[in-house]
A protein has these predicted regions:
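Short, structured active-site "lid" loops
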Residues: 47-66
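Small-molecule-sensing regulatory modules
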Residues: 2-45, 50, 70-86, 90-99, ...
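Signature of uroporphyrinogen-III synthase
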Residues: 58, 101-103
Length: 292
């Protein structure tokens, strides 16, 4: 009996290329077509389609898709009844969560949310924004923004905006100032509840989740391999962190040992000179595709 086909929703737009790259590192080659939104994927158990992140949660809820990647913000905004399989911390700019912030003109008198009572707010995240001001008992006029939200204040179309940002670069470029954080968000892998009850679909969902998580984890790690004299082993080992402990194996020359370990990319540039000074030789550094 043929395995069920999993219907996968991939985000279109700013997350599109980072997501396709992540799937590539996880083992799935996704090839886009210039004239449609149905990319090929090198797995007969999966059919993929590109969708707007705003639409994916409801497509998952309604069973149009079995599995998809979207923002935690859009799951909250749509109130979609979906299973959050895992958090996947990656984005178009960094591997950090993004923030929806309340921002005003840099030269405006507004210093806190309460100062905006009776004012006009522009945002794409209408539901979350409405809840934010309602919880604080601040009466405001919230208008939907169809894009270029940062420009609304500059153009005099709004007194403040609620917009998503990773680095605040665009916020500052429009002479805006953040006065509060509305929501922290990141990419999530979400599934249809019925699909999670189907054994074959669940198996495939868990496989995808495992390998995507492994690919993300590998981004911040590298493998180091080196040789060291047995007499200097302790000095070299003292410098080596690892997920568990370094692998040590004897070489044919009994006076030398081979060592292998996984370390954070952030310490490599300092670690390699220290290892060399401690007596290690033939030091190799190589990237990892997945760490499970």
């Amino acid at each position: 009996m043929a395995n069920p086909i999993l219907k996968l929703g991939l985000p279109k737009g700013s997350l599109e290329d980072p997501t396709i790259d992540l799937f590539d590192r996880a083992g799935w080659k996704v090839r886009k077509h210039p004239r449609n939104y149905f990319p090929d994927i090198n797995d007969p158990e999966i059919t993929a389609r590109l969708c707007r992140v705003q639409e994916i949660p409801l497509y998952i809820q309604d069973g149009v898709l079995d599995l998809g990647l979207t923002g935690k913000d859009w799951v909250k905004e749509t109130k979609a009844d979906v299973v959050v399989v895992s958090d996947l911390i990656y984005s178009k700019v960094s591997n950090k969560p993004a923030r929806w912030v309340l921002a005003v003109a840099d030269d405006s008198p507004y210093q806190k949310p309460e100062d905006l009572a009776g004012k006009r707010i522009a945002t794409e995240l209408m539901g979350v924004c409405t809840e934010y001001f309602k919880e604080r008992n601040i009466p405001v006029n919230i208008n939907y923004s169809w894009g270029a939200t940062e420009a609304k204040v500059v153009e005099g179309l709004a007194d403040a905006i609620v917009e998503v940002t990773e680095t605040e670069t665009s916020i500052r470029a429009h002479d805006l100032r953040v006065i509060d954080e509305v929501l922290v968000t990141n990419t999530v892998l979400i599934a249809n509840a019925a699909a999670m009850q189907d054994p074959e679909k669940r198996r495939k969902i868990e496989q995808i989740d495992l390998l995507l998580q492994g690919a993300l984890r590998a981004e911040s790690l590298v493998c180091l391999k080196m040789n060291a004299p047995a007499a200097k082993l302790d000095a070299v080992l003292a410098l080596l962190p690892s997920l568990n402990s370094p692998t040590v194996a004897p070489l044919q020359n009994g006076e030398w040992l081979s060592l292998e370990t996984v370390v954070s990319t952030g310490i490599v540039r300092d670690l390699i000179p220290q290892l060399r000074e401690a007596g290690a030789e033939g030091i190799l550094e190589y990237a990892l595709n997945k760490v499970i």
